[in-house]
Amino acid sequence: MDFLGNGYMRNKSIKFLEFAGEVGNMIGARRIVTHIGPYNGISSKDAIDRLVPIFQQMRNHYLEKGYTSQICFELAGKHDLFGSIREITELCRRVKGTAPCINWPHLHARGNRWLNDRESFKRVFDYLQASLGLTKFYTHFSGVEFDIEGNERHYSPIKKGEIKFEYLAEVILENGYNVLTISDSPLMEHDAMYMKLITERVQSRRMERIARREASEKIKESRKAAAEAK
């Protein structure tokens, strides 16, 4: 996609998204996800100013056609592509009815490999809630590999990547976030099941901790009651 390109490339991208909306409507797709493409030499601010009317018209086109699919803008991992989390959030804020697609490996690469603990994932959810008031989140997950200069090269299986899905699962479960996570891994189905397994393990450990804490509190209350009875 190249929504910031010359007239031909921009119009071609618009036609692709119109067609995606038509097909998505036929199959009952809930979301139509798109990248924006390269900056083509313009600033981030100018890019957003150009994109807003394009996607306002596209949103209106979907509504006029009766399409129920939501347009989602996916984060980009490379710095020459439009798609930082702040850019995508601002675009969604200005084009009502659209939403971000949080691609975790792209975000990790774009942010100089910073998704390395639970708190870093939590900050993303906090930012999206504060900026857009989101209560539902649509995300993509996989491993990611880098070239010798530290630039994003390609997706990898989750076990070979440096982003730990356990951290994401813990943050989702502990905060009760409503999150749909899609596997972008080269081992798509395998890693989808792997993420499900990790989530179940995290939830099991979480419930065990809660049970132990509740049992400990009951013991304390029982001992306190016994002491008072004396």
Region annotations inferred by a language model:
Residues 121-131, 159-174:
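A short, acidic, amphipathic alpha-helical segment used as a generic capping/interface helix at domain edges
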Residues 24, 91-92, 128, 172, ...:
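Generic structural signal for hydrophobic
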Residues 150-162:
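Glycine-rich phosphate-binding "P-loop"
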Residues 2-101:
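Active-site acidic/histidine proton-transfer and metal-coordination neighborhood
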Residues 57-151:
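Acidic/histidine-rich catalytic cores of soluble enzymes
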Residues 30, 137, 178-179:
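Short acidic/polar active-site loop segments enriched in Thr and Asp
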Residues 1-4, 148-152:
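N-terminal small/glycine-rich loop or linker at the start of catalytic domains
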Residues 169-230:
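C-terminal accessory extensions appended to soluble enzyme cores
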